[in-house]
């Protein structure tokens, strides 16, 4: 993969370049080779260790469990972009992969989202309501913090986008909105 044109890459990306020219470019973002730490950093603007997600729960060594940076829940007092935008009057929704905790107080509603349809696991099948790894028996989907299921004609990307649109259509269109849409299909099985 290469950078967008606005960031010096050789790919022609005129629409993205135009957006970049009218917006803000963030140049200090850090990614992790693991999904939860990357999402925690993206949502908070903080280093993964400070968020509580230095790794993912599925590979957390026993000796690190519960230690600072390895709580596998967003640390107390850590604010997400959704927290900040909701406080500024935005309607906030998320639809897609969460994997930042599924206990009470760890779901998206506890972190600034008005509405959410969230996959709490590291991943799930893109076509069926089932796990794609032996860590989980079922795919743990939640709507607004309550256990949920997906429809029979489920395809993850279509469902995630359709759910986000449904949430936006059901809210006050006069308010600005923040829609966080972390797709599941970037994970296996592709």
List each model region and its residues:
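Formylglycine-dependent sulfatase
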Residues: 1-190
